[in-house]
């Protein structure tokens, strides 16, 4: 696994050793940064000064530091100012290029090109360079089979994990948020939102986690606003789409969502946690929120209303029905916990069976863990 992260204070000791070792033996280099002197102490001081710039990145393979990347911006182009790697292969290169593409898109560049002036090019990327020594990255550059995956809470029980893997879904675990309330730090629907099969949006703090685990063909945008543990900034991504409608409270939705889904008509609801409150399928919704129920029906979207409450959410009086599960066409509605433990199970099962939707549940409390996202 290739993991890219912002340069942080905790990385400076290890990175100084890395830079010191490679100072005369770079696979890629534009020019050696004059601030990175030969003396290791000077290197550490220089690196610490760069942390606040937020354009210096470290590259790991598993837990081993293998690279260092410095970016710069110039006339709507993203420049690789410096890149130092102690090994190179297609997997590493493409993960770096995928990160660069996300970075450009999240900064709303008109074009996605990267200059490599003075670099030595690996055979892997020579065919992708234009006559100005630039690389334009497109999704079809990433020759990957589109494997099925599910993003689930890192607190999910083994029964669910085995079920998903047994149905050929790769499991991606949620990020452990340090900005959210600890009781919902694992909740998928607070951290990441699916736009379509090839594009997702995630919170700023979770980007490097999801970029490491998501396939390279997925474009991963980042929220414009920073998530907090207070409403409305705790639910920037907690909205949903159905039949070309975006169901949300505009006061709590991140601007990036509105830009990416500008062609969808907005159904305005009072509920800021609209995804938490709703089971969303291709053709209908099941919700415990009366404002969502009434609003979507006005647009001729089929909806079912279920009683609120009686759902476990540690530290809270109750959880939300949408947070208990996720939907995909081949598996139906997949629950984190045991539907038999849900007070209103008969009504919920009635809705699902009326629509010929399969459902699966595991042996756990009927619990809200922040939805499951399938792709």
Label every model-predicted segment.
Residues 113-124, 134:
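Conserved beta-strand-loop-alpha-helix junction that forms the acyl-donor binding cleft
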Residues 42-58, 67:
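A short helix-loop-beta-strand connector motif used in the catalytic cores of GNAT acetyltransferases and
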Residues 1-26:
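A short beta-loop-alpha structural element at the N-terminal edge
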Residues 82-92:
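A short, internal acetyl-CoA/4′-phosphopantetheine-binding micro-motif in the GNAT/acyltransferase core
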Residues 95-111:
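Conserved acyl-CoA
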Residues 140-375:
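Histidine/cysteine-enriched polar flanking segments
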Residues 24-45:
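Conserved GNAT-fold acetyl-CoA-binding loop/helix
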Residues 58, 64-72, 79:
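Conserved beta-strand in the GNAT
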């Amino acid at each position: 696994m290739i993991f890219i992260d912002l340069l942080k204070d905790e990385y400076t000791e290890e990175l100084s050793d890395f830079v010191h070792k490679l100072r005369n033996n770079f696979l890629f280099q534009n020019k050696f940064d004059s601030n990175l002197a030969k003396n290791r102490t000077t290197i550490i001081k220089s690196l610490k000064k760069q942390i606040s710039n937020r354009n210096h990145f470290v590259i790991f393979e598993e837990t081993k530091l293998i690279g260092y990347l410095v970016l710069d911006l110039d006339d709507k182009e993203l420049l690789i100012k410096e890149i130092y790697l102690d090994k190179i292969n297609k997997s590493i290169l493409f993960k770096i290029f995928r990160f660069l593409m996300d970075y450009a898109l999240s900064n709303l560049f008109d074009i996605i090109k990267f200059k490599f002036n003075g670099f030595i090019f690996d055979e892997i990327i020579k065919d992708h360079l234009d006559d100005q020594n630039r690389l334009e990255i497109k999704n079809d550059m990433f020759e990957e089979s589109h494997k099925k995956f599910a993003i689930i809470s890192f607190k999910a029980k083994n029964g669910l994990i085995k079920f998903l893997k047994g149905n050929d879904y790769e499991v991606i675990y949620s990020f452990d948020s340090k900005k959210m309330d600890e009781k919902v730090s694992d909740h998928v629907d607070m951290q990441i939102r699916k736009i379509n099969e090839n594009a997702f949006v995630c919170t700023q703090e979770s980007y490097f986690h999801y970029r490491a685990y998501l396939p390279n063909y997925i474009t991963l945008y980042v929220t414009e606003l920073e998530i907090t543990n207070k409403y409305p900034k705790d639910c920037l991504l907690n909205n949903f789409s159905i039949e070309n409608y975006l169901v949300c409270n505009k006061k709590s939705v991140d601007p990036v969502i509105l830009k990416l889904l500008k062609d969808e008509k907005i159904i305005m609801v009072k509920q800021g946690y609209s995804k938490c409150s709703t089971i969303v399928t291709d053709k209908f919704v099941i919700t415990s929120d009366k404002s969502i129920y009434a609003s979507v029906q006005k647009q001729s979207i089929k909806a079912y209303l279920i009683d609120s409450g009686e759902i476990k959410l540690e530290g809270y009086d109750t959880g939300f029905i949408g947070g208990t599960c996720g939907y995909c066409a081949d598996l139906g509605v997949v629950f984190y916990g045991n539907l038999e433990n849900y007070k209103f199970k008969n009504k919920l099962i009635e809705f699902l069976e009326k629509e010929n939707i399969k459902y699966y549940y595991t042996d756990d409390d009927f619990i809200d863990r922040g939805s499951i996202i399938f792709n």
